[in-house]
Design a protein with these regions (language model features):
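A short C-terminal boundary segment appended to hydrolase-like catalytic domains
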Residues: 262-364, 470, 499-525
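Glycine- and acidic
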Residues: 17-23, 158-160, 316-325, 374-378, ...
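Feature captures C-terminal
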Residues: 2, 14, 29, 110-117, ...
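A broadly tuned preference for mixed-charge, low-complexity surface segments
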Residues: 49-66, 191-202, 236, 241-244, ...
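Alpha-helix initiation and N-capping motif
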Residues: 31, 74, 100, 287-294, ...
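Acidic, metal/ion-coordinating pockets
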Residues: 1-284, 326-332, 337-338, 348, ...
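Short, compositionally biased low-complexity segments
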Residues: 5-12, 149-150, 300-314, 366-368, ...
Length: 525
């Protein structure tokens, strides 16, 4: 018998083949195309096919934002997911972004089980109902264990995870996998998390915080036949230590496929071979049935995105994202103004989240807002010391490195194993210089507020997004206990409201920071 396991991960609400930057696109990604590919494979197979979603399905696109914020319930979106034919799903970290009540409603509306063994409720039981699922195919039994990154409390608002306990995925797998080996012939672990170490060398590829435990699962938990991963948006397909592994990127660019050849020997099922690959949707057309059913809803979203929100004298268009991070930009300073006005603070931190951000032209639509400010962030004001703020700036300054020809470039720490443009922050309301010719941790100078040097013990109020305020991105100098007030309105709405309050925006650049290299010798970090 051949068992085929198909998997998606980190779809992030990209159902249609569009990034929503304009209408009527046909880009090489999206769940409608993945659905067509799944149907093709199922039609060609006579042996069993399992279809699994590995999490981060509920948030991430204008479609999911519209569903959550305008419709205020997930049922239209979950009815889309129900058309795909998933046999099971797993909770991802972004599932909590719109609150646990919204997540619970979504999970309840799905017609397939959503698994997670290592997120427990206040009774110590799996919070979403099931830890694992058993599938029977004639005389072959397959066990599927769902696991999620334990790092969610470091990113999420406390109200969204109240009453939940997050266990280590590895510790949880050590408990469950031996039991599942007794119940099943094949054990699959679907983990919404990635790899913390290089699969070949075992060298750490990131800070070992527990956010990603894929390498540890692979090497410290025996009995796993297939490990489906995600979260990092990487593209991985391999067989390592006799375990078939996939990670299919994000937004439905790729479909993970694992094929197992299983044979009965002396009354016992034996896996003879394992193959892992990623299938592209580049040549695949969108599922016409799903497209027809939900076209009216998609047009409703497109109309909402096209509504005019505000006007700008000139523009805030972004030509070179790297130059924005080196020298600032009117778009970034506009975001600072929105944050400072909403919170009454004079110091603000924000990021250019992605290199795909185009900024704003003279006429700003809702489409412009949600495709530039892509996360459903709320704002938090933190009270920190001068030492804390300097440490945060040093963390951001580590984004830069110098090439052998002494050109500024992005540090590999912010590019591998996952691009992290969103973890480089720019600040307004203070002045500072980043000198990249100095070692990491010693790059900040001329660090002033209102013209005066900021001292280590100075107390400052700073507005940043909620993700950063609780230490997200390994900004350990920030934490929930330093938050003194919060704005619970989504940042996208705050931007739209700012435009509505101000008839016409004039672009401005604060010119309050510089990135330089002052020394001739090159420091190797």
């Amino acid at each position: 018998m051949k068992l085929t396991i198909l998997s998606t991960s980190d779809i992030h609400g990209y159902i249609y083949p569009t990034d929503y930057k304009k209408r009527k696109q046909d880009l090489p990604f999206g769940l409608l195309k993945i659905s067509s590919l799944i149907n093709e494979i199922k039609a060609a197979e006579t042996d069993p096919v399992l279809v699994i979603d590995n999490g981060d399905f509920l948030q991430g696109s204008p479609l999911t934002y519209y569903t959550a914020k305008q419709k205020q319930q997930p049922l239209i979106y979950t009815s889309l997911l129900n058309q795909v034919g998933f046999d099971a799903g797993v909770i991802g970290n972004h599932e909590f972004n719109y609150g646990k009540e919204y997540l619970d409603e979504a999970v309840k509306a799905l017609d397939y089980p959503v698994l997670c063994a290592n997120i427990l409720n206040d009774q110590g039981q799996p919070a979403f109902g099931k830890a694992y699922e058993l599938f029977a195919f004639d005389d072959l039994t397959v066990a599927l264990l769902g696991l999620t990154t334990q790092y969610i409390p470091n990113w999420e608002q406390p109200a969204s995870i109240n009453g939940l306990t997050f266990q280590s995925a590895t510790a949880c797998a050590k408990e469950y996998v031996p039991k599942l080996r007794e119940l099943a012939d094949v054990v699959i672990v679907s983990y919404h998390g990635g790899f913390e170490k290089d699969l070949t060398t075992g060298e750490p590829t990131e800070a070992l915080t527990g956010e990603n435990e894929g390498y540890e699962l692979l090497n410290k938990v025996s009995g796993i036949d297939v490990l489906l991963t995600g979260h990092q948006h990487r593209e991985i397909a391999t067989v390592d230590s006799s375990v078939a592994i996939t990670q299919p990127g994000d937004k439905g660019h790729k479909l993970g496929k694992v094929c197992l050849t299983v044979e009965k020997q002396d009354g016992k099922s034996v896996i003879l071979s394992k193959k892992a690959e990623l299938l592209s949707v580049n040549e695949t057309k969108a599922n016409p049935t799903m497209e027809e059913i939900f076209n009216t809803f998609q047009e409703e979203i497109e109309d909402w995105l096209d509504q005019n929100i505000g006007m700008i004298t000139g523009n805030m268009l972004i030509g070179d994202p790297f130059q924005v991070r080196l020298a600032g930009h009117p778009y970034i300073d506009f975001i600072h103004k929105v944050q400072m006005e909403a919170t009454g603070t004079t110091i603000s931190g924000t990021a250019l989240f992605t290199n795909d951000s185009k900024g704003f032209g003279p006429t700003v639509t809702m489409r412009d807002i949600v495709t530039n400010y892509i996360y459903p962030n709320t704002l938090a004001v933190v009270r920190v010391t001068g030492a804390d703020l300097r440490q945060a700036l040093e963390k951001s300054a580590s984004y830069f490195s110098l090439s052998p020809s002494r050109q500024f470039e992005v540090s590999s720490d912010f590019m591998y194993p996952k691009a992290q443009q969103y973890n480089y922050d720019m600040y307004a309301g203070i002045d500072y210089i980043i000198d990249v010719s100095f070692p990491v941790g010693k790059r900040i100078s001329q660090f002033t507020y209102s013209g005066k040097p900021i001292q280590e013990n100075d107390e400052l109020e700073v507005v940043i997004n909620q993700y950063r305020a609780v230490g997200g991105g390994n900004y350990d100098m920030f934490s929930a206990d330093k938050i003194i007030r919060e704005i619970t309105v989504d940042m996208t709405e705050l931007i739209a409201d700012y435009f509505k309050k101000h008839d016409r925006i004039t672009p401005d650049t604060f010119n309050n920071f510089q990135v330089i290299q002052s020394k001739k010798e090159l420091h190797v970090n």
